[in-house]
């Protein structure tokens, strides 16, 4: 009797999890599909990959390495302007060489399948800021602009569990912990040639601006806009309305 009850409970739990995951997937996809966008949810290099492409796409696009559907007002505004949106889920990876190679493969796929530009706007929210900065530093020719929102820029000043996990991942990739711990200080100079917009909450206790992006030497930045939100914490990300961010990302880059 107990075994039958256990099996029934297990089956019910499985069905509930399946239904919940389906509803969760549909909850962000359906509005885009209803508006006529092409939505693809696939797997690239073993990671979840998402593309949202308007009918009259202009080839420009914005992509993020984490947080599908979260604080998406900038993405939505750009979609209305003919931009496309992409995500490669690297949430629990910390910009290891393998993760960066996967993102390059993701960008190549978007270019080949949808005609998206070889240069992408990287959207780094919170932990996504770390990946965006490392990738832009290593692949500046593949990045059009950076939109960083409450960005984690120096992992050594974050929570211990994340520092440990990141250090383990980098060491497994053959990168010594000493280099990982000085990476933010030593390796972000090359991003100064990219247009960058940074939005942050002035009362953010999780990723304080003055301990993160605010520690960088910003002299020599080609095009930099920093917007602080008085009295705002780590959330909400973005701005309301988000026109200032959209204008910065959409304006031409003059070489």
In which residue ranges do the predicted regions lie?
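N-terminal cap/lid segment of alpha/beta-hydrolase-fold proteins
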Residues: 26-57
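C-terminal catalytic histidine-bearing segment of alpha/beta-hydrolase fold enzymes
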Residues: 210-255
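The feature captures the conserved acid-bearing segment of alpha/beta-hydrolase catalytic domains
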Residues: 156-220
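Primarily recognizes the serine-hydrolase "nucleophile elbow" in alpha/beta-hydrolase
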Residues: 119-172
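Short amphipathic alpha-helix adjacent to the substrate-entry channel of hydrolases
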Residues: 70-86
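Bacterial N-terminal signal peptides
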Residues: 11-21
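Short beta-strand element of the alpha/beta-hydrolase
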Residues: 58-67
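Alpha/beta-hydrolase active-site loop
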Residues: 94-115, 134
């Amino acid at each position: 009797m107990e075994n039958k009850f256990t099996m029934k409970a297990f089956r019910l739990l499985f069905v509930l999890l399946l239904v919940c995951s389906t509803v969760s997937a549909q909850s962000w996809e359906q509005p885009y599909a209803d508006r006529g966008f092409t939505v693809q949810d696939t797997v690239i290099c073993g990671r979840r990959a998402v593309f949202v492409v308007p009918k009259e796409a202009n080839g420009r696009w914005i992509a993020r390495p984490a947080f599908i559907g979260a604080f998406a007002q900038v993405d939505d505004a750009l979609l209305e302007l003919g931009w496309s949106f992409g995500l490669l889920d690297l949430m629990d990876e910390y910009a290891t060489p393998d993760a960066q190679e996967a993102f390059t493969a993701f960008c190549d796929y978007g270019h080949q399948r949808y005609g998206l530009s070889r240069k992408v706007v990287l959207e780094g929210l919170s932990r996504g800021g770390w990946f965006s900065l490392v990738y832009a530093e290593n692949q500046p020719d593949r990045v059009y602009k950076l939109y960083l929102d409450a960005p984690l820029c120096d992992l050594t000043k974050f929570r211990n569990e994340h520092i440990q996990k990141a250090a383990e991942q980098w060491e497994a990739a053959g990168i010594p912990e000493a280099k990982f711990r000085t990476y933010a200080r030593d390796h972000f100079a090359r991003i100064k040639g990219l247009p960058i917009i940074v939005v942050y909450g002035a009362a953010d206790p999780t990723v304080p601006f003055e301990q993160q992006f605010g520690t960088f030497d910003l002299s020599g930045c080609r095009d930099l806009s920093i917007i602080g939100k008085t009295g705002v914490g780590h959330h909400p990300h973005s701005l309301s309305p988000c026109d200032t961010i959209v204008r910065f990302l959409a304006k031409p880059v003059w070489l």
